[in-house]
């Protein structure tokens, strides 16, 4: 009998299965300053295929230079207290047979000074500072 519809063909027509090529590249570089006091190191790598693309980069900066900067000191807080002002009355003398009371004077209370240190929320005062030989960053 005839088995043409059920058997595999003897020849296969068409292109062979080929994986498309991938393109890759990588680079590294180190730039050093005079006397090797500071350096910038870079590394990058890329892989590209017809279906995807991936890149990675790493950049590192080091600075071992000695740099002297004056220390900044905050000014001392100033607190001011107003003087306590009072008014004293004299007591009149009672008749000889009477009882003389001393005038009552309330204790003088001075107004307190201002708080010596002002506190803020942490995110409002958080900052970063970097100082190098030729660069300074702060925020």
Swiss-Prot record:
Recorded source organism is Locusta migratoria
Q: What is stated about domains? A: The tetrapeptide (A-A-P-[AV]) repeats found throughout the protein are also present in many proteins constituting the protective envelope of other species.
List the protein's name: Cuticle protein 76
Q: Which InterPro entries match?
A: Cuticle_C1
What is the role of the protein in this entry?
A: Component of the cuticle of migratory locust which contains more than 100 different structural proteins.
sequence repeat residues: 7-10, 68-71, 75-78, 93-95, 105-108, 121-124
Q: Which UniProt keywords apply?
A: Cuticle, Repeat
Molecular function in Gene Ontology: structural constituent of cuticle
């Amino acid at each position: 009998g005839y088995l043409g519809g059920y058997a595999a063909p003897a020849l296969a027509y068409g292109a062979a299965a080929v994986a498309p090529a991938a393109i890759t590249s990588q680079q590294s570089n180190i730039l050093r300053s005079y006397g090797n006091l500071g350096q910038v190191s870079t590394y990058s790598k890329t892989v590209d295929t017809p279906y995807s693309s991936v890149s990675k980069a790493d950049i590192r900066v080091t600075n071992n230079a000695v740099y002297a900067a004056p220390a900044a000191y905050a000014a001392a807080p100033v607190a001011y207290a107003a003087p306590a002002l009072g008014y004293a009355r004299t007591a009149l003398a009672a008749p000889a047979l009477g009882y003389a009371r001393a005038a009552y004077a309330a204790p003088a209370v001075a107004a307190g000074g201002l708080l010596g240190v002002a506190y803020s929320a942490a995110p409002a005062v958080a900052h970063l500072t970097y100082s190098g030989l030729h660069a300074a960053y702060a925020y």
